[in-house]
UniProtKB/Swiss-Prot annotation:
The keyword Flavoprotein does not apply. Substrate binds at S60, D147, N159. It comes from the Bacteria. Signal peptide: none annotated. This is Glutamate 5-kinase. The lineage of its organism: Bacteria, Pseudomonadati, Pseudomonadota, Betaproteobacteria, Burkholderiales. It catalyses: L-glutamate + ATP = L-glutamyl 5-phosphate + ADP. GO terms for cellular component: cytosol. It is found in: Cytoplasm.
Length: 378
């Protein structure tokens, strides 16, 4: 990590971008949409379009707009009330963006996604194809989580995560996360005035996760840690991430012109195939298996499949075909993938050689608990 910037922003060379705009940047401090702010973002994205760049906008603001329309001053905690606010507010959010982009001769499209949409392989591919078609048509997709139908168990959790997943979905060159903070600091600048600003780092650097923490404003849901984890996700498709203040004048167009603004997190992690990204990011974890040191080494350094003999413990309940995390003896995740046996059967065959599976279970569907083609090292 360094406080020095590179000479030119990575955004200048990016042809396909995902820009995530937080609630605080499109609302009047949570009291409904700020139409001037919406117009401002539309103008900047229109300028990027004129440069030949394709842009997908991930925008928060539906719940805040719904709260304003319903006369609620405090964000509700009950899921059904949040969903009601989202249903009311999404109408206003789409209308505002449609009107704003129309001033520049651009059409918009509403894309509402849930985790289940991306967890299902066919729906994942359909969403991908639809977004590519919209971009080819010169349409600006406005993406948000479908808050009206999601539950706590299937939520993305925040639009930073959604932005990263969309970045991977469309193979974008870069992700821009706009927030109400300048970028990343080595400590919370609101508590430590001497905190050093981080202008440049590598996405996936473990030190970043250790530094980050705390929630953002009371309007949205994402703190700085979620942004760092989003950058790590995006890096696995080769996309760079910039975390910058949306309060900076014309921040998007200036980044596109090569100006270095905010924190730039470069993608240096191994680029995963589309299938590996889907396995790692879009499927819900159903449990964990604790591995001994030998099994961890085999997965990380030898590219081997996971065998029952290397499993020390099973945590949680899962079925064959679910996504399960592989963790070491200290609880650190090293891989995840599709499991070939249920949690009940895995408990019966752990610490056993594969040659004993048929004797213990009565039959053997696979010699591996997790085949190397169906797992990804994390």
């Amino acid at each position: 990590m360094t406080a020095q910037t590179s000479a030119v922003s990575v955004i200048s060379a990016a042809n396909r971008l995902v820009a995530k705009v937080g609630s605080s940047l499109v609302t009047n401090e949570g009291r409904g949409l700020d139409r001037a702010a919406v117009d401002h973002w539309a103008a900047q994205i229109a300028a990027l379009h004129q440069q030949g760049k394709q842009v997908v906008l991930v925008s928060s603001g539906a719940i805040a707009e719904g709260m304003a329309r319903l006369g609620w001053r405090k964000r509700p905690s009950a899921m059904h009330e949040l969903q009601a606010a989202a249903a009311v507010g999404q109408m206003g959010l789409c209308q505002a963006y449609e009107a704003a982009f129309a001033e520049f001769g651009l059409r918009t499209a509403q894309i509402l996604l849930t985790h289940e949409d991306l967890a299902d392989r066919h729906r994942y591919l359909n969403a991908r194809s639809t977004l590519f078609a919209l971009l080819r048509l010169g349409v600006v997709p406005i993406v948000n989580e479908n808050d009206t139908v999601v539950t706590d168990e299937i939520r993305f959790g925040d639009n930073d995560t959604l932005g990263a997943l969309v970045t991977n979905l469309i193979e974008a060159d870069a992700l821009i996360i706009l927030t109400d903070q300048r970028g990343l600091y080595e400590a919370d600048p609101r508590c430590d005035p001497a905190a050093r600003f981080v202008a440049h780092a590598q996405a996936g650097d473990a030190a970043l996760e250790a530094m980050a923490g705390g929630a953002g404003s009371g309007v949205g849901t994402g703190g700085m840690l979620t942004k760092i984890l989003a950058a790590k996700r995006a890096a696995h498709s080769g996309a760079h991430t910039v975390i910058a203040s949306g309060r900076e004048r014309n921040v998007l167009t200036r980044l596109a012109q090569g100006e270095c603004i905010g924190t730039e997190l470069r993608a240096v992690l191994p680029v995963w195939s589309a299938r590996k990204q889907w396995l790692a990011d879009h499927l819900r974890l159903r449990g964990r298996v604790v591995l001994d040191d030998g099994a961890v080494h085999a997965l990380l350094h030898e590219g081997k499949s996971l065998l029952p003999i290397g499993v020390a413990e099973v945590q949680g309940e899962f079925e064959r075909g679910d996504v399960v995390a592989c963790v070491d003896m200290h609880g650190r995740e090293c891989a995840r993938g599709l499991i070939n046996y249920s949690s009940a059967d895995t408990r019966r065959i752990l610490r056993q050689p594969s040659s004993q599976i048929a004797r213990i279970l009565g039959s053997m569907t696979d010699p591996e608990l997790m085949h190397r083609d169906n797992l990804v090292v994390t």
